[in-house]
């Protein structure tokens, strides 16, 4: 059973070899790695082609134009030859037995989706380029799914129960740490929406609500870089705020369209609003409120790019929507920017100490 590992790449010279090497070093050997380059302007393509010239399982694919990680993942999905597909970012890593555990679960259950419940976060600051060099005792096991199972668990077929689980935080929206049956994706025409953010949440949710056999395994297998230069962890500027606002509003439109096409949701349309609110709240708490706090209302109100986003989605009602939004955010208590390096260290130091004490 071949597994296709798809890795979107853009200007990742510092980290990509370490990420790909973590795949090449897997105990499960029947895989291919599709590195899909999104028109990098650095030496990423060159170093990958040179480093893996004698490794036939690793292929570098060049996009014709820069179109973002969603388009890169979609291209990889089109070209994938494996029976299953999984994803890894070009600055993350995977434990050596990751694909073996994925394959074992898939073979036992014939799953459409295999879903791990957490991630491993390096408890060092700064995180080294070679994320695989972080000692095991410095990796914090972050079980993101609430009420995560202790053993391999097949979700009920009841889609309403799956929606309830999603709303309760049981199934997170990341695509790394999950593996998808290729025919399931193709038969349901499941692809990533062309959004700057939240496209992974929309994709994962659509898979959750369309899958036949959906399996959770109680593992944290992906080593995830919390602090980096990706869009979701970018510098808090008016331009960044415009991007996350556009992603949130645009994602809301796309998600509503995709939910409306799911048979169960068609029969129970009351779920649409509840899901939209849940996803918007997640974007709000993690991205929008921290950025609003740092950028400030004055800079946000006067920015042409941000005003254009409001006008594009709300037309003549943009002024009222902006005022309501800004007034509400002025009244909210401050929330931490979880992706700043200083707060990152403070946030995880005690948790890492507690974890190591329990394991010891």
PLM region spans:
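Short, well-formed alpha-helical segments that are part of the catalytic scaffolds
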Residues: 11-25
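Cell-envelope/extracellular polymer assembly enzymes that use nucleotide-activated donors
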Residues: 2-4, 22, 32, 202
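Glycine-rich, basic loop-to-helix element that forms the pyrophosphate-binding segment
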Residues: 63-80, 93, 101
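Short aromatic/hydrophobic "clamp" motif used to bind/position activated sugar donors
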Residues: 85
């Amino acid at each position: 059973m071949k597994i296709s590992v798809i890795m979107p790449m853009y200007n990742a010279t510092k980290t990509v070899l370490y990420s790909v090497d973590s795949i090449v070093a897997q105990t499960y050997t029947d895989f291919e790695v599709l590195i899909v380059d999104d028109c990098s302007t650095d030496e990423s393509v060159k170093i990958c082609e040179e480093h893996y010239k004698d490794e036939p399982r690793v292929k570098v694919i060049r996009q014709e134009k820069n179109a973002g990680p969603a388009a890169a993942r979609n291209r990889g999905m089109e070209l994938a030859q494996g029976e299953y597909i999984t994803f890894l970012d070009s600055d993350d890593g995977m434990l050596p037995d990751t694909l073996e555990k994925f394959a074992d679960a898939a073979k036992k259950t014939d799953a459409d989706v295999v879903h791990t419940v957490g991630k491993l976060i390096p408890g060092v600051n700064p995180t080294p380029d070679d994320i695989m060099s972080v000692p095991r005792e410095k990796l914090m096991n972050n079980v993101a799914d609430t009420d995560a199972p202790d053993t391999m668990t097949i979700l009920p077929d009841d889609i309403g129960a799956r929606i309830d689980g999603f709303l309760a935080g049981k199934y997170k929206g990341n695509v790394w740490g999950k593996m998808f049956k290729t025919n399931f994706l193709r038969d349901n025409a499941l692809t990533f929406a062309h959004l700057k953010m939240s496209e992974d949440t929309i994709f994962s949710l659509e898979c959750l609500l369309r899958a036949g056999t959906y399996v959770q395994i109680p593992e944290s297998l992906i080593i995830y870089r919390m602090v980096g230069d990706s869009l979701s962890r970018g510098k808090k500027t008016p331009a960044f705020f415009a991007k996350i606002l556009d992603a949130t509003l645009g994602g809301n439109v796309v998600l509503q369209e995709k939910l409306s096409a799911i048979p169960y949701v068609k029969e129970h349309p009351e779920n649409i609003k509840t899901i939209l609110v849940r996803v918007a709240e997640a974007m709000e708490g993690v991205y929008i409120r921290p950025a609003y706090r740092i950028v400030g209302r004055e800079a946000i109100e006067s920015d042409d790019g941000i005003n254009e986003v409001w006008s594009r989605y709300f037309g003549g009602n943009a002024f009222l929507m902006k005022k309501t939004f800004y007034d509400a955010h002025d009244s909210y208590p401050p929330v931490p920017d979880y992706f700043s390096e200083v707060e990152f260290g403070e946030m995880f130091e005690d948790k890492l100490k507690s974890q190591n004490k329990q394991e010891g």
